Each structure stands twice: as structure tokens, then as C-alpha cells.
A protein has these predicted regions:
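Hydrophobic alpha-helical transmembrane bundles of multi-pass membrane proteins
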Residues: 1-400
Length: 400
């Protein structure tokens, strides 16, 4: 029976890893559909290459930073318990690789290709796993200290803060240091519209992310005996809440409609194992509204050129999710309890602060040492031709 349980657990978390791996296709198509046609190839290549670099760096360095264990032992030892530790690495890698995928959407259309790969390596090798180890592996006694002060540890079941808020708040200084796309905000005060190049591809990306998210959340249990239907239904309710609110507040704009469910899912990750489904619905509704309001503010009023709105979507909705777990996870609001609002505020603030510092240091250093932004000429030409020497539809542009 023990062998059967080990095999089932390995299969369970492997399937979770595959589902979250598929989410990276969602990141790619969401970005492809949002950017202009001259940057579509770049969007696809970036996500795949970022994932590949993340895999190597997380295997060699990042996983050890987070969990204090490495893979520099014999294959016989690695294969123990049906290779559970290896597939656990695979699953957690897909989370780590989401960080550069999130950042990619914010810096799209004008970031240099190679400096971003260096940033990916540093972020996935150290910046992200440092906080991951604090939140999920009791590093440095931070969780014990939070529990001493508040009575409970910081709770983040599936990464509202650890993954999404950290990714979004790293992206914010990256976007600001990079600056806006050429002529996005004109000297006369007007804003040049850059509408999505393909709503169908944007929608495809959103749907792939939505489906994969159920692996992201449900399989965060990591073993089969800890699986909970509550996590699945809470994820569903937050998703639809975000969709409906974004539909209403975004005035039926398809970009908002397809990002609304993602906002809800980002926010519910932290407390999806604790909340009542109606609480999850409220969390998703708030997240959908938060995304629409803050995306509009950042783009139009504050003139922060965050192309996919990754700071509102992941940074702010992830922050809300960390806090919401302490509100709607409480027994007084129908949750399972065992969570504390003060603990959630402390853990969330720590994650946000670390991400801001990490983003500022990594992208600030790269800006000084090698530059992070394309020239106006390269940007005008587009990243597809500038970096990859081919456009998304060469057959339509050149007579062979």
C-alpha cells in the first residue's frame, strides 16, 4: 500500500506540474494577443526561453536556496519514492518560472532580449526562492516570529503573494526603469492607442491560464490525501466573480473581460483552501474591480506603460489575495479558520517589500551596466525583426 501511495503522490504532483507548464502557453498567447503584430514572435520566444533558463537555474541554485536541498547526488537516490522529490521540483519550478513570464508582459515591446534573460536567471536563482523559502519552508525563523507576534503563521496556500504579488511587484520597478514605449505618451499630452493585435489569441491565452490554474491551486496540496474539492470550487467562484465584475466595470471591453477571471484566480490562491465559496466569490469580484480601476489609472493617469497590466493583475490582486485570506478564511465569515489578518498583513508586506527591492536592484544594475531598452529605431522596427529577423506573417510581407 505504501508503494501505491508513493506512486499516486508522484503522479498527482506530476500532473499538477504539467498543468502549470501548460499555463506558460497561456502567458505566451496572452502577451501575443496584446502586443502589436511586430512583437508577436518575440512574445512567443521570450516565454519559452525564459522557462528554459528558469529550469536550469532553479535546478542548480534556486531550489536549494528555497528548500535547502539539491540534486547533486546519484540517480538512484533521486529515483527514491518513485522520484517524488524530482516531480515536486518540476511542480515548484513551474511556479518559479511564472515570475519572468509575469514580468515579460509588463516590459513587452521595448525591452532588450539578452539583459532580460540575465534578469530571469538572477530572479529565479535567488530573488524569488529567497522569499519562497521564508513563506513555504520556515527559513530564517520569520514564520515562527510572525506566529509569536500574531498567533498564526502567514498563510499562502498556492501563491497569491509568493508567486503573483512578488512577480508583479518586481515588474513595477522594471517597467518604470525601462520607460514607456516610444511615442506612447506624446509631448502634447495625448496618449497613442496601442490596441491588442489579436483578441482571439488574447482570449486563447486567458482560457489556457484559467484551465491550468486548477492544477496550480488544487495540486498545491502536493499529495493525493490532502486534495480538497473546496480549493477547486473556490477557484471557480473567484474566477467567475472576477469575470463578471470586469465585464461590468470594464464596459464589456474584451481585454478586461478576459483578464477579469485571471484577477480573481490570482487573488484566491492564498486562501483557496480556507474560504467558503461565497467568500471566494467576493474576493474574485473585488479583484476584478481592482484590476480594471488600477489598470486604467496606471496607463492613463500615472502614465506607467505596463503593457499587459501585470502590476495591477498580479502585484495588486496578489496583495489583495494575501490580505483576503486573513479576512474570508476566518470562521466568522464561514472559513475554516487558523489564519490571522495581522499575520497576513505582515507576510504580504514582507513579500511586497522584498520584490520591490529585488526588482530595483536587478533592473537598476542591468540598466547601468548594459542597458535594458531598445533604441527608438529598433522599437519602431519591432522586436520580431530586430531580435529574431522574422515577422509573425512573413508570407504576407515578402514574395518568395
Amino acid at each position: 500500500m505504501e508503494a501505491l501511495k508513493q506512486g499516486a503522490d508522484a503522479l498527482f504532483i506530476l500532473l499538477g506540474g504539467i498543468m502549470v507548464l501548460a499555463m506558460h502557453a497561456g502567458f505566451a498567447f496572452l502577451e501575443l494577443g496584446t502586443v502589436r503584430k511586430k512583437n508577436q514572435v518575440n512574445a512567443l520566444v521570450k516565454i519559452l526561453v525564459d522557462f528554459s533558463v528558469s529550469t536550469v537555474v532553479y535546478f542548480v541554485v534556486g531550489y536549494s536556496v528555497a528548500y535547502g536541498t539539491g540534486f547533486f547526488v546519484g540517480a538512484e537516490q533521486l529515483a527514491a519514492k518513485n522520484g517524488y522529490e524530482l516531480v515536486k521540483f518540476f511542480f515548484l519550478l513551474t511556479f518559479a518560472a511564472a515570475i519572468p513570464a509575469i514580468i515579460s508582459g509588463g516590459i513587452a515591446e521595448r525591452a532588450k532580449f539578452w539583459p532580460q534573460l540575465i534578469a530571469t536567471a538572477v530572479i529565479v536563482g535567488f530573488v524569488y526562492p529567497f522569499f519562497e523559502g521564508i513563506a513555504w519552508n520556515q527559513h530564517f525563523g520569520v514564520q515562527a516570529w510572525i506566529k509569536t507576534v500574531t498567533g498564526d503563521e502567514f498563510h499562502d496556500f498556492a501563491g497569491s503573494v509568493v508567486v503573483h504579488a512578488v512577480g508583479g511587484w518586481i515588474a513595477l520597478p522594471a517597467v518604470i526603469l525601462l520607460g514607456a514605449r516610444y511615442n506612447r505618451y506624446r509631448k502634447d499630452g495625448q496618449i497613442s492607442a496601442h490596441p491588442p493585435s489579436s483578441i482571439p489569441f488574447l482570449a486563447l491565452g486567458a482560457w489556457i491560464l484559467i484551465v491550468g490554474w486548477f492544477g496550480f491551486n488544487v495540486m498545491s496540496a502536493q499529495t493525493l490525501d490532502k486534495i480538497s474539492g473546496l480549493v477547486a470550487v473556490n477557484s471557480l467562484m473567484a474566477m467567475v466573480g472576477g469575470t463578471i465584475t470586469a465585464l461590468l466595470m470594464g464596459k464589456n471591453d474584451p481585454g478586461f473581460v478576459h483578464n477579469g477571471p485571471l484577477a480573481g484566480l490570482v487573488a484566491v490562491c492564498a486562501g483557496s483552501d480556507l474560504m467558503h465559496p461565497l467568500g471566494a466569490l467576493v474576493v474574485g469580484c473585488v479583484a476584478g474591480a481592482l484590476f480594471v480601476i488600477m489598470f486604467t489609472l496606471t496607463q492613463n493617469k500615472w502614465k506607467i506603460d505596463d503593457v499587459l497590466g501585470v502590476w495591477p493583475l498580479h502585484g495588486l490582486c496578489g496583495t489583495w489575495g494575501g490580505i483576503a485570506a486573513g479576512i474570508f478564511g476566518s470562521q466568522s465569515l464561514g472559513g475554516l479558520g487558523g489564519v490571522n489578518l495581522n499575520a497576513q498583513l505582515m507576510g504580504t508586506a514582507l513579500g511586497v517589500g522584498w520584490a520591490l527591492l529585488g526588482g530595483l536592484v536587478v533592473y537598476g544594475s542591468l540598466k547601468v551596466l548594459m542597458g535594458i531598452k531598445m533604441s527608438p529605431e529598433e522599437e519602431y522596427e519591432g522586436a520580431d525583426l530586430t531580435v529574431h529577423k522574422i515577422s509573425a506573417t512573413p508570407d504576407r510581407e515578402v514574395s518568395w
